[in-house]
């Protein structure tokens, strides 16, 4: 303990480098160490101490003041806390120089029986600081009474309580501190710290002693006296009459000191040079530090956190705290830690962001400025605007009409994320029916949201000042309502017509524990993102300046997503979303399903060894005659990367005896198997003189297109894929498809009737395209095989007739025909 106290005292010394060097060199001198030891022994010698007190007494008597040194005799010790920060000890001591206690009879208060009014003289010494075992400092005060007072306290319990209360009150009034009376405890020890004598100064009746005649004055004047000289005519100091004692009441539990710190997580994307980049004013965590200097263990404390209220109760010592927090917190994820060295309870509480934004948005911030002619304010309480108030704008003499689509907050929504239906409300003539439980993901219900985005509300949200919400997509557990301004319907504004959402171009890559979605749409408005995440699917809708988009992503039952909030990064040209895989589904997945909604999903394959082999088998496979046998083709994989696959296939046998041997077949795909938004098929046929040759390209620019592949025994195929260009709009191109002409013998072998069938590709019927020629695709066999180039699935069709656009690419081909 002495070592710790010495080290703490040395740490408090403010020494310069020169002083440290001089002290170091001095203590290295043996003569200096001997002299320093003699000095320490001299000042600690009791005899020298007595001589020092006699000299001080004589000097003070010459000044007309009687000085008496009060040496405290041990009594008992009170332990409490000082200003709620650290421990404090009050030594209740005795000395015969202090006045004896006295009492006088007096009437009781409030109709109580008559009693005795006590007067308890005491002497105080300034507080002294010591260092504890852990380096923590504590303060010690000495309150000295007459020995008779301590004798009465030992024999009467109520008198002892009065004596202790008087000692604590004297320290508070004299030194201006606050002691914890409720948790004051009497220790078994008799004295704490090192005893130090106090001084009692009383003026002498005769005043200052006159200087004798003939005595020369001193060369130096007396040093200034630090205390005020009392008048000689005044009598000796009397103990002030103590006020009438108050009714003895047990004090209330002590309210400990506490501090609340708001902790934010720094994210560099909040400091980009962009309108949507702004740090949120809502903190991520609240750190509450509670000072409990008398609490030895956290087992005696009871902590409860609910919503925005923190409650702490403790018995022995008695603490009671009711703290109102600035933000609602998630008590289920909070943690508390008690620091025994500092006697502090540190509680870390994550802020419930969704509830905090809703509470902040509903809190009035004073009178809002009137805008427009209707003076109606529409409040948005969702992830679109974080937490801020919006003023609705309207133009013209007529009052604008408001329509809001409001979803229940997270507290009223079900676990599956269903929306609780609300009754219809009339907002100035435009009534909106709430969405039902199963209508939240259909494109028809999303059209109202997109029409509101087109009216300029989404852009205005980013421009308004205030608290910006996180750009993270809300999960099914944190669904919040959005309110959109659709005023101007009577004026023929852009909000009068609902825009059907489009399916955006999407690329999906994977690793062992996450999926990365690349949405190649430029100009995405961050505040328009609305997502719904579940273990088996992910739905997202957003909008740009000109249009709205929506897509649904699903996976196999054995592949599950984590419900962790997705990470979203938005740039000027695209958006990247990272979805975490569930821990039990880590690894490489085989396929994924994607489409505009759940009714139009398509299967997509990830790039792995199994899918590549299956794709190669589908490419080289053709519906040949059973009697015709081909040698296995020579397949050579030139390059397999994330962005490109190059395959070289060489056939060993051709049905045409005059044809070329060893025809080469090249397959090149410039994008992953999962990215087949735009595919281009080129077919080149070489046959005898009775056959015609046609070269055409089939280009499909749609979200759910299906490519037709018709096998011919002696026709090599070249498949090439092109990455979707990131333009906002592209004019649809004509669909061109070729069919080979067959010889007369082959036409006679056709036995099955031909059935006309129209196929809808990209939303347009082929029959509606200009310059179309109906061509019957006939073959030697009863069936034909249709291969979907997007997922490799094969469909067998017995009777099939297709309508296609027929176009010649070369004038020589036209002459040959």
From Swiss-Prot:
Keyword RNA-binding in annotation: no
Quaternary data: Interacts with CFAP300. Interacts with DNAI2 and HSPA1A. Interacts with DNAAF4. Interacts with DNAAF6/PIH1D3.
Region (Disordered): 233-259, 385-404, 410-445, 473-503, 653-692
Phylogenetic lineage: Eukaryota, Metazoa, Chordata, Craniata, Vertebrata
Modified sites of kind Phosphoserine: 622, 631
Basic and acidic residues composition bias: residue spans: 386-401, 661-680
Keywords (A to Z) from UniProt: Cytoplasm, Phosphoprotein
Family assignment from sequence similarity: Belongs to the PIH1 family. Kintoun subfamily.
GO biological process, one term: outer dynein arm assembly
Signal sequence annotation: none
Gene: Dnaaf2
InterPro entries to which the protein is assigned, alphabetical: Kintoun, PIH1/Kintoun_subfamily, PIH1_N, PIH1D1/2/3_CS-like
Any Pfam family: PIH1_CS
One annotated Gene Ontology cellular component of this protein: Golgi apparatus
Keyword Plastid: no
Ranges annotated as biased composition (Polar residues): 681-692
Protein name per its UniProtKB record: Protein kintoun
Protein role: Required for cytoplasmic pre-assembly of axonemal dyneins, thereby playing a central role in motility in cilia and flagella. Involved in pre-assembly of dynein arm complexes in the cytoplasm before intraflagellar transport loads them for the ciliary compartment.
Broad class of where this protein is predominantly found: cytoplasm
Compartment(s): Cytoplasm; Dynein axonemal particle
